[in-house]
UniProtKB/Swiss-Prot annotation:
NCBIfam families xref list: ispH_lytB, PRK01045.1-2, PRK01045.1-3, PRK01045.1-4
Annotated protein name in UniProt: 4-hydroxy-3-methylbut-2-enyl diphosphate reductase
Organism, scientific name: Rhodococcus opacus (strain B4)
Similarity comment text for this entry: Belongs to the IspH family.
Function text: Catalyzes the conversion of 1-hydroxy-2-methyl-2-(E)-butenyl 4-diphosphate (HMBPP) into a mixture of isopentenyl diphosphate (IPP) and dimethylallyl diphosphate (DMAPP). Acts in the terminal step of the DOXP/MEP pathway for isoprenoid precursor biosynthesis.
Substrates-to-products reaction catalysed: isopentenyl diphosphate + 2 oxidized [2Fe-2S]-[ferredoxin] + H2O = (2E)-4-hydroxy-3-methylbut-2-enyl diphosphate + 2 reduced [2Fe-2S]-[ferredoxin] + 2 H(+); dimethylallyl diphosphate + 2 oxidized [2Fe-2S]-[ferredoxin] + H2O = (2E)-4-hydroxy-3-methylbut-2-enyl diphosphate + 2 reduced [2Fe-2S]-[ferredoxin] + 2 H(+)
Binding site for isopentenyl diphosphate: H66, H99, H149, S247, S248, N249, S292
Protein backbone atom coordinates (compact mmCIF):
# COMPACT_ATOMS: atom_id res chain seq x y z
CA UNK A 1 0.00 0.00 0.00
CA UNK A 2 1.58 3.23 -1.14
CA UNK A 3 0.33 6.53 0.20
CA UNK A 4 3.00 8.79 -1.23
CA UNK A 5 4.01 9.93 -4.69
CA UNK A 6 7.66 11.06 -5.05
CA UNK A 7 7.93 14.60 -6.32
CA UNK A 8 10.55 17.04 -7.49
CA UNK A 9 12.07 18.61 -4.38
CA UNK A 10 12.57 21.93 -6.14
CA UNK A 11 14.88 23.76 -3.70
CA UNK A 12 16.60 26.81 -5.12
CA UNK A 13 20.18 25.93 -4.18
CA UNK A 14 22.56 28.53 -2.87
CA UNK A 15 26.20 28.50 -3.99
CA UNK A 16 27.55 26.75 -0.89
CA UNK A 17 24.99 26.81 1.90
CA UNK A 18 22.23 28.93 3.37
CA UNK A 19 24.86 31.04 5.14
CA UNK A 20 26.32 32.21 1.82
CA UNK A 21 23.14 33.94 0.67
CA UNK A 22 23.33 37.69 0.24
CA UNK A 23 22.88 39.83 3.32
CA UNK A 24 19.21 40.48 3.96
CA UNK A 25 18.06 37.61 1.74
CA UNK A 26 16.30 35.39 4.22
CA UNK A 27 14.09 32.43 3.43
CA UNK A 28 12.12 29.61 4.98
CA UNK A 29 12.16 26.10 3.57
CA UNK A 30 8.89 24.42 4.51
CA UNK A 31 8.94 20.63 4.50
CA UNK A 32 6.07 18.84 2.81
CA UNK A 33 4.76 16.47 4.01
CA UNK A 34 4.66 17.46 7.66
CA UNK A 35 2.19 17.39 10.54
CA UNK A 36 -0.78 15.09 11.00
CA UNK A 37 -0.54 11.59 9.62
CA UNK A 38 -3.59 9.46 8.87
CA UNK A 39 -3.37 7.61 12.18
CA UNK A 40 -3.20 10.79 14.26
CA UNK A 41 -6.01 12.41 12.28
CA UNK A 42 -8.15 9.33 12.92
CA UNK A 43 -7.32 9.25 16.64
CA UNK A 44 -8.06 12.92 17.27
CA UNK A 45 -11.28 12.75 15.26
CA UNK A 46 -12.24 9.63 17.21
CA UNK A 47 -12.13 11.57 20.47
CA UNK A 48 -13.95 14.56 18.98
CA UNK A 49 -16.73 12.37 17.56
CA UNK A 50 -17.00 10.44 20.83
CA UNK A 51 -17.50 13.74 22.64
CA UNK A 52 -20.21 14.75 20.18
CA UNK A 53 -21.98 11.40 20.48
CA UNK A 54 -21.64 10.70 24.20
CA UNK A 55 -20.90 14.06 25.82
CA UNK A 56 -18.31 14.85 28.46
CA UNK A 57 -16.61 13.42 30.32
CA UNK A 58 -14.96 10.74 28.26
CA UNK A 59 -11.70 9.16 29.33
CA UNK A 60 -8.55 8.51 27.31
CA UNK A 61 -5.82 6.14 28.46
CA UNK A 62 -2.48 7.98 28.22
CA UNK A 63 -2.29 10.85 25.70
CA UNK A 64 -4.41 10.27 22.60
CA UNK A 65 -1.38 11.47 20.60
CA UNK A 66 1.92 12.86 21.83
CA UNK A 67 1.23 16.56 21.40
CA UNK A 68 0.79 19.04 24.22
CA UNK A 69 -1.52 21.39 22.31
CA UNK A 70 -3.85 18.59 21.23
CA UNK A 71 -4.07 17.15 24.74
CA UNK A 72 -4.70 20.54 26.35
CA UNK A 73 -7.35 21.43 23.76
CA UNK A 74 -9.23 18.17 24.30
CA UNK A 75 -8.92 18.51 28.08
CA UNK A 76 -10.65 21.88 27.83
CA UNK A 77 -13.52 20.15 25.99
CA UNK A 78 -14.11 17.60 28.74
CA UNK A 79 -11.68 14.79 27.96
CA UNK A 80 -10.02 13.24 31.01
CA UNK A 81 -6.61 11.68 30.40
CA UNK A 82 -5.61 8.85 32.73
CA UNK A 83 -2.58 6.61 33.07
CA UNK A 84 -4.40 3.36 33.85
CA UNK A 85 -7.86 1.88 33.55
CA UNK A 86 -8.38 1.70 37.32
CA UNK A 87 -8.61 5.51 37.33
CA UNK A 88 -11.76 5.37 35.18
CA UNK A 89 -15.18 5.10 36.89
CA UNK A 90 -16.84 1.74 36.30
CA UNK A 91 -19.10 1.75 33.26
CA UNK A 92 -17.59 4.94 31.79
CA UNK A 93 -16.38 5.42 28.21
CA UNK A 94 -12.65 4.90 27.64
CA UNK A 95 -10.72 5.57 24.42
CA UNK A 96 -7.43 3.79 23.80
CA UNK A 97 -4.75 6.04 22.31
CA UNK A 98 -3.22 5.88 18.83
CA UNK A 99 -0.19 4.06 20.26
CA UNK A 100 -2.08 0.86 21.03
CA UNK A 101 -2.48 -1.21 24.19
CA UNK A 102 -1.68 -4.75 25.27
CA UNK A 103 -4.28 -7.51 25.74
CA UNK A 104 -3.88 -7.05 29.50
CA UNK A 105 -5.19 -3.49 29.21
CA UNK A 106 -8.22 -4.67 27.23
CA UNK A 107 -8.87 -7.27 29.93
CA UNK A 108 -8.55 -4.68 32.69
CA UNK A 109 -11.07 -2.44 30.95
CA UNK A 110 -13.51 -5.31 30.52
CA UNK A 111 -13.18 -6.22 34.21
CA UNK A 112 -14.30 -2.69 35.11
CA UNK A 113 -17.23 -2.89 32.68
CA UNK A 114 -15.86 0.03 30.70
CA UNK A 115 -17.23 0.92 27.31
CA UNK A 116 -14.22 1.21 25.03
CA UNK A 117 -13.33 2.71 21.67
CA UNK A 118 -9.98 1.71 20.21
CA UNK A 119 -8.18 4.56 18.40
CA UNK A 120 -5.01 2.53 17.82
CA UNK A 121 -3.39 3.47 14.52
CA UNK A 122 -4.03 0.67 12.00
CA UNK A 123 -0.30 0.60 11.22
CA UNK A 124 0.42 -0.11 14.88
CA UNK A 125 -2.26 -2.79 14.86
CA UNK A 126 -0.41 -4.37 11.93
CA UNK A 127 2.72 -4.73 14.08
CA UNK A 128 0.59 -6.25 16.87
CA UNK A 129 -0.73 -8.82 14.41
CA UNK A 130 2.80 -9.62 13.26
CA UNK A 131 3.92 -10.15 16.85
CA UNK A 132 1.04 -12.55 17.51
CA UNK A 133 1.63 -14.44 14.28
CA UNK A 134 5.34 -15.01 14.85
CA UNK A 135 4.80 -15.86 18.50
CA UNK A 136 2.37 -18.58 17.41
CA UNK A 137 5.15 -19.90 15.18
CA UNK A 138 7.49 -19.86 18.20
CA UNK A 139 9.91 -17.23 16.87
CA UNK A 140 12.08 -15.04 19.03
CA UNK A 141 10.86 -11.53 18.21
CA UNK A 142 13.40 -8.71 18.47
CA UNK A 143 11.36 -5.53 18.86
CA UNK A 144 13.40 -2.45 17.97
CA UNK A 145 12.08 0.52 19.91
CA UNK A 146 12.40 2.85 22.86
CA UNK A 147 11.98 1.43 26.35
CA UNK A 148 8.91 2.81 28.10
CA UNK A 149 7.17 4.06 24.95
CA UNK A 150 3.46 3.17 24.99
CA UNK A 151 3.59 1.64 21.53
CA UNK A 152 6.42 -0.70 22.50
CA UNK A 153 4.61 -1.74 25.67
CA UNK A 154 1.47 -2.54 23.70
CA UNK A 155 3.26 -4.56 21.04
CA UNK A 156 5.41 -6.47 23.53
CA UNK A 157 2.30 -7.24 25.54
CA UNK A 158 0.90 -9.26 22.65
CA UNK A 159 3.60 -11.92 23.15
CA UNK A 160 5.63 -11.18 26.28
CA UNK A 161 7.28 -14.60 26.32
CA UNK A 162 8.62 -14.16 22.79
CA UNK A 163 9.49 -10.45 22.55
CA UNK A 164 12.82 -8.85 23.50
CA UNK A 165 13.22 -5.09 23.31
CA UNK A 166 16.26 -3.84 21.39
CA UNK A 167 16.71 -0.14 22.17
CA UNK A 168 19.20 0.87 19.48
CA UNK A 169 22.47 -0.57 18.15
CA UNK A 170 24.19 -0.50 21.54
CA UNK A 171 21.63 -2.97 22.93
CA UNK A 172 22.38 -5.68 20.40
CA UNK A 173 25.15 -7.42 22.35
CA UNK A 174 22.77 -8.24 25.20
CA UNK A 175 20.30 -10.10 22.96
CA UNK A 176 19.99 -13.86 23.37
CA UNK A 177 17.80 -16.21 21.34
CA UNK A 178 16.76 -19.84 21.67
CA UNK A 179 17.09 -20.84 18.01
CA UNK A 180 19.06 -18.67 15.59
CA UNK A 181 17.05 -20.05 12.67
CA UNK A 182 13.79 -18.66 14.08
CA UNK A 183 14.45 -14.98 14.77
CA UNK A 184 12.60 -11.99 13.33
CA UNK A 185 12.84 -8.27 13.96
CA UNK A 186 9.89 -5.89 14.24
CA UNK A 187 9.96 -2.21 15.14
CA UNK A 188 8.17 0.69 16.70
CA UNK A 189 6.53 2.68 13.90
CA UNK A 190 8.05 6.08 14.74
CA UNK A 191 11.79 5.41 14.73
CA UNK A 192 14.61 6.90 12.71
CA UNK A 193 14.87 4.80 9.57
CA UNK A 194 18.66 5.14 9.50
CA UNK A 195 19.20 4.16 13.13
CA UNK A 196 16.80 1.25 12.80
CA UNK A 197 18.75 -0.07 9.81
CA UNK A 198 21.97 0.27 11.82
CA UNK A 199 20.39 -1.80 14.57
CA UNK A 200 19.20 -4.40 12.07
CA UNK A 201 22.67 -4.61 10.54
CA UNK A 202 24.18 -5.24 13.97
CA UNK A 203 21.55 -7.86 14.73
CA UNK A 204 22.21 -9.60 11.42
CA UNK A 205 25.92 -9.76 12.19
CA UNK A 206 25.02 -11.79 15.28
CA UNK A 207 22.11 -13.70 13.77
CA UNK A 208 22.67 -14.19 10.01
CA UNK A 209 19.30 -15.92 9.58
CA UNK A 210 17.41 -12.94 11.04
CA UNK A 211 14.14 -12.49 9.16
CA UNK A 212 12.69 -9.14 8.11
CA UNK A 213 9.08 -8.21 8.88
CA UNK A 214 6.59 -9.01 6.10
CA UNK A 215 6.33 -5.27 5.34
CA UNK A 216 7.85 -2.06 6.68
CA UNK A 217 6.97 -1.46 10.32
CA UNK A 218 8.21 2.15 10.34
CA UNK A 219 5.15 3.96 9.06
CA UNK A 220 4.92 5.82 5.78
CA UNK A 221 4.46 9.18 7.52
CA UNK A 222 7.53 8.79 9.71
CA UNK A 223 9.60 7.91 6.65
CA UNK A 224 8.15 10.70 4.50
CA UNK A 225 8.83 13.39 7.10
CA UNK A 226 12.40 12.21 7.51
CA UNK A 227 12.96 12.21 3.73
CA UNK A 228 11.68 15.79 3.44
CA UNK A 229 13.97 16.94 6.25
CA UNK A 230 16.95 15.22 4.64
CA UNK A 231 16.19 17.03 1.38
CA UNK A 232 16.24 20.51 2.90
CA UNK A 233 18.67 20.18 5.83
CA UNK A 234 21.90 20.66 3.82
CA UNK A 235 20.62 24.11 2.81
CA UNK A 236 19.63 25.15 6.33
CA UNK A 237 21.45 27.14 8.96
CA UNK A 238 18.64 26.17 11.32
CA UNK A 239 15.83 23.61 11.27
CA UNK A 240 12.90 24.17 13.62
CA UNK A 241 10.87 21.05 14.34
CA UNK A 242 7.44 21.72 15.79
CA UNK A 243 6.52 18.91 18.17
CA UNK A 244 6.43 17.78 21.77
CA UNK A 245 9.37 16.28 23.61
CA UNK A 246 7.53 13.03 24.29
CA UNK A 247 6.84 12.59 20.58
CA UNK A 248 9.28 9.99 19.30
CA UNK A 249 8.89 10.89 15.64
CA UNK A 250 9.36 14.62 16.37
CA UNK A 251 12.56 14.03 18.33
CA UNK A 252 13.83 11.85 15.49
CA UNK A 253 13.31 14.74 13.04
CA UNK A 254 15.75 16.89 15.02
CA UNK A 255 18.30 14.07 14.88
CA UNK A 256 17.73 13.55 11.16
CA UNK A 257 18.12 17.28 10.44
CA UNK A 258 21.44 17.44 12.25
CA UNK A 259 22.65 14.23 10.64
CA UNK A 260 21.73 15.51 7.17
CA UNK A 261 23.72 18.71 7.46
CA UNK A 262 21.67 21.36 9.25
CA UNK A 263 23.94 23.58 11.34
CA UNK A 264 21.43 23.63 14.21
CA UNK A 265 18.02 22.15 14.97
CA UNK A 266 15.58 22.67 17.83
CA UNK A 267 12.27 21.18 18.94
CA UNK A 268 9.48 23.55 20.01
CA UNK A 269 5.83 23.11 20.93
CA UNK A 270 4.90 26.71 20.17
CA UNK A 271 6.30 29.70 18.29
CA UNK A 272 6.85 31.50 21.60
CA UNK A 273 9.53 28.91 22.44
CA UNK A 274 11.71 30.01 19.52
CA UNK A 275 14.69 31.90 20.95
CA UNK A 276 15.46 34.98 18.80
CA UNK A 277 19.16 34.29 19.42
CA UNK A 278 18.80 31.16 17.27
CA UNK A 279 18.21 33.46 14.28
CA UNK A 280 21.42 35.48 14.64
CA UNK A 281 23.34 35.28 11.37
CA UNK A 282 20.82 32.82 9.92
CA UNK A 283 19.70 33.12 6.30
CA UNK A 284 17.85 29.84 5.72
CA UNK A 285 15.48 28.28 8.24
CA UNK A 286 13.85 24.93 7.62
CA UNK A 287 10.53 24.11 9.26
CA UNK A 288 8.85 20.77 9.70
CA UNK A 289 6.54 19.19 12.26
CA UNK A 290 5.92 15.82 13.80
CA UNK A 291 3.07 13.53 12.82
CA UNK A 292 0.90 14.60 15.78
CA UNK A 293 1.22 18.37 15.25
CA UNK A 294 -1.72 20.49 14.02
CA UNK A 295 -0.86 22.92 11.23
CA UNK A 296 -1.88 25.97 13.28
CA UNK A 297 1.29 25.53 15.36
CA UNK A 298 3.47 25.52 12.24
CA UNK A 299 1.74 28.67 11.01
CA UNK A 300 2.60 30.32 14.29
CA UNK A 301 6.30 29.68 13.68
CA UNK A 302 6.06 30.96 10.09
CA UNK A 303 4.39 34.16 11.33
CA UNK A 304 7.11 34.64 13.94
CA UNK A 305 9.85 34.22 11.36
CA UNK A 306 8.09 36.70 9.09
CA UNK A 307 8.38 39.27 11.88
CA UNK A 308 12.15 38.65 11.82
CA UNK A 309 12.48 39.25 8.08
CA UNK A 310 11.97 35.73 6.75
CA UNK A 311 9.33 36.63 4.16
CA UNK A 312 10.25 34.14 1.43
CA UNK A 313 8.65 30.74 2.14
CA UNK A 314 9.59 27.93 -0.25
CA UNK A 315 7.92 24.51 0.00
CA UNK A 316 10.17 21.46 -0.20
CA UNK A 317 7.87 18.70 -1.40
CA UNK A 318 9.11 15.13 -1.48
CA UNK A 319 5.78 13.25 -1.36
CA UNK A 320 2.03 13.72 -1.48
CA UNK A 321 0.11 11.82 1.20
CA UNK A 322 -3.41 10.68 0.40
CA UNK A 323 -4.05 7.89 2.91
CA UNK A 324 -7.17 8.14 5.10
CA UNK A 325 -8.16 5.61 7.77
CA UNK A 326 -11.78 4.84 8.63
CA UNK A 327 -12.96 5.76 12.10
CA UNK A 328 -13.52 2.99 14.65
CA UNK A 329 -16.66 1.01 13.91
CA UNK A 330 -18.63 2.62 16.76
CA UNK A 331 -18.24 6.09 15.21
CA UNK A 332 -18.23 5.58 11.46
CA UNK A 333 -21.74 6.90 10.93
CA UNK A 334 -20.66 10.11 12.68
CA UNK A 335 -17.92 11.02 10.19
CA UNK A 336 -18.69 13.93 7.86
Amino acid sequence: MSSAVPLNVGITRSADSGASRADGEKRVLLAEPRGYCAGVDRAVETVEKALEKHGAPIYVRKEIVHNRHVVETLSDQGVVFVDETDEVPEGALLVFSAHGVSPAVHESAAARNLRTIDATCPLVTKVHQEAKRFARDDFDILLIGHEGHEEVEGTAGEAPDHVQLVDGPDSVDAVTVRDESKVIWLSQTTLSVDETMQTVARLRERFPSLQDPPSDDICYATQNRQVAVKAMAPECDLVIVVGSRNSSNSVRLVEVALGAGAKASYLVDYAREVDPAWLDGVRTVGITSGASVPEILVRGVIDLLDEHGFHDVQPVTTANETLVFALPRELRAART
